[in-house]
Amino acid sequence: MAENGEEKLLAVARHIAKTLGHNESMADDILQIFSNFDGRFSREKLAEGQAGEDGSGVATLERALNSIDGQISRFVAADQPIWADPADSAAFLDTIDELVAIIREWSPMASEKPIGICLTRADDMMQQAMFRIEEEFRSLMERGAESFGLNPQGDAGAMNHRFDSEEEEDDDRDFNNGDDIQIPVAQPLTDYDLIIDALPSATINDLHEMAKRMLGAGFGKACSHVYSSCRREFLEESMSRLGLQKLSIEEVHKMPWQELEDEIDRWIKAANVALRILFPSERRLCDRVFFGFSSAADLSFMEVCRGSTIQLLNFADAIAIGSRSPERLFKVLDVFETMRDLMPEFESVFSDQFCSVLRNEAVTIWKRLGEAIRGIFMELENLIRRDPAKAAVPGGGLHPITRYVMNYLRAACRSRQTLEQVFEESNGVPSKDSTLLTVQMSWIMELLESNLEVKSKVYKDPALCYVFLMNNGRYIVQKVKDGDLGLLLGDDWIRKHNVKVKQYHMNYQRSSWNKMLGLLKVDNTAAGMNGLGKTMKEKLKQFNIQFDEICKVHSTWVVFDEQLKEELKISLARLLVPAYGSFIGRFQNLGDIGKNADKYIKYGVEDIEARINELFKGTTTGRK
C-alpha cells in the first residue's frame, strides 16, 4: 500500500515537472528542487519514471497515427468521390478531426526528437488528406453548379425582399437549418424579377464542412483558391450569357457608334443583373460556405467577382474617356445613370476591406462619366462656334444648326435632374437665382443666337435677313416653351425673346413695306389739281411696280410658323390696305383725271388683300 502511494507521489512529481517545465533546463531545475526536499524524489527515480512514461506516450502516438494513416490512405486511394456516400464523407471528416487534434496536442513537444518525427509524419498525412478534400471540394462545386434550376417569380416585391439586409441576417443565423438558399446561375436573364437556384442547401452544408477542415488545418488559401476559381468561371459564363463581351478599352473606342449603342444597352442590362442579383447572391453563398471565417469569405468573394466587376467598370470607363461627340450624350447619360443608380449596390455588396478597391474604382468612373457629359456640352459649344456662315438658307427659313441645337437641348432636358446633378458636381459656383445647368443652357442659347446673327448677314436683302431671324427666333422660343428647357430658362427669358421676335417683325416691315406706305402719302401742298393728279399718278405707277416686285419676291420666302405667318399678313394688311384704299379713293375724285382712274389703278383693295395673302408660300420643309 505504501509502495503504491509512493508511486502515485512520484507520478505527481513527474507531472508537475513536465507541466511547469517549459523547456528541458527548467524541468531539470524543478527535479533538483524535489530531490533536495525529499530523498524519495531523487533525480534518478524521477527521471527514470519520466523516461518510461514518455516512451509509452510515443508508442501511443505512433499507434494512433498508424490507425489514421490507414484510414486516410484508403480514402485518398478511393476511385469514387468520397462525398457520394454520406457515411464515407462523415468518416473522412472524423479522421481529419482526429489528426488535427493529435497535431495540436503534441505540437508543444515537437522539440523532442521522437515526437517531432511523428509530427512530421502527421503533417504529411494531413497534406494528403487536404489534397483529397480539395479535389472533393472542387468536384462538389462543379456538380452543384451543373444541377442549378431557374424559376421565374412573378412578384417583384418578393424578389426585392429577398435581397434586403434583414433577410441576409436571418439566412446567416439559419445556415444549418436545411432551408434552400437562392443563388445565381449562368442563364440568360431578361428580368430582375427572378429566384435562382444554383447549389442545393445540402451541397452548401457539405462545402462548409470541407472548408472548415481546410481552414482549420491551415489550408485556407488553397480552399479559397478552389472556391474562387469555380465560382468565377461560373459567374463569367453568366455575364457572357447576358450578352456582355470582353472588350478592351481600345476595342470599345474603335467600335462603330451604332454597334457601340447596342453594346451599351447590353452593358446596362448586365450591370443591373450583376449588381442586383448575381453579386449579392455570390456574397451570400460565400458567407454560407465560409460561415465562421469572415476573412476567408471576404477574400473569396472578392476573387470571384473581381474579374466580372472590372469588366463592367472598364467598359464604363471606356465610354467615359472616349469620344465626346455631341450625339453620344444620351448613351453616356444612360451609362452615368446606371452607375449612379447602382452606387448603393456597389457600397453594400463590396463593403469589406478586400473589395474597397473595386468600390472606390466604381465611384471614380462614375465621376469620370460626369466629366465626360460636361465635356460633351463643351464640344456642343465648339460645334456651334465652328458652324460656318456659308450659303444662305433659301427663303430665310430655319437653319439646320437651329433645328439641331434646339431638338438636342430639348432631348437632353428630359434628363434634367441628372444633368443638374452632373453640373452641380463640377467646380463651378451657381448664381443666387439659377443652377449651373441653367447657366450652361443660357450660354449655349447665347452662342446659338450670336451664330444666327452672323449667318443673317449672308442675306443681301435686309428684309430677308429679318425673316431669317424671325423664323429662327420663333422656333427657338417655341421649343423652349414646350419642354423642360423652359423650366430651366424661365418665363422672363421667354418674354424677352418673344419681344425679340416682334422686333424682327417690325424691322422686316420697316425695311420693305414702309417704303410702299410712303408712296401712298400725298403732299397737299402740290400746286393745283393738275399738279396733284400728276404726282398721284406717278406714285400709283411706282406703287404698282414695287408692289408687284415685293409680292413676287416675298411669296417665295418662308415663314414656317402658321400663327406667325397670319400675324404678319394681318399686320401688313392693316398697314397697307387702309392707306391704299384712301389713296385710290382720293385719286378717283380728281376731276378729269379721276374719270380715267381705272386706266392707272391696277389693283383694287380686295386685290391688295389677296396678294398679301399669297406671301410667304415658300417651302416649309425642315420644320421639325
From Swiss-Prot:
Target of the E3 ubiquitin-protein ligase PUB18 that mediates its ubiquitination and degradation via the 26S proteasome. GO terms for cellular component: cytosol; endomembrane system; exocyst; extracellular exosome; phagocytic vesicle; plasma membrane; vesicle. It is found in: Cytoplasmic vesicle, Phagosome; Endomembrane system; Cell membrane; Vesicle. Interacts with EXO70B2, SEC5A and EXO84B. Binds to PUB18. Binds directly to B1L at the plasma membrane and in small vesicles. Belongs to the EXO70 family. Residues 148-176 are annotated as: Disordered. The keyword Membrane applies. It comes from the Eukaryota. This is Exocyst complex component EXO70B1. It holds the Pfam family Exo70_N. One of its GO terms (biological process) is defense response to fungus. GO terms for molecular function: phosphatidylinositol-4,5-bisphosphate binding. Keywords: Cell membrane, Cytoplasmic vesicle, Membrane, Transport, Ubl conjugation. Disruption phenotype: Twisted leaves with small spontaneous lesions, early yellowing of leaves and anthocyanin accumulation defects. Chlorotic shoots. Retarded growth with wrinkled rosette leaves under long-day growth conditions. Impaired abscisic acid (ABA)-mediated and mannitol (drought)-promoted stomatal closure. Increased number of lateral roots. Plants impaired for both B1L and EXO70B1 produce more lateral roots than single mutants. Component of an exocyst subcomplex specifically involved in autophagy-related, Golgi-independent membrane traffic to the vacuole. Regulates autophagosome formation and autophagy-related Golgi-independent import into the vacuole. Positive regulator of both abscisic acid (ABA)-promoted and mannitol (drought)-promoted stomatal closure. Involved in the regulation of lateral root formation.
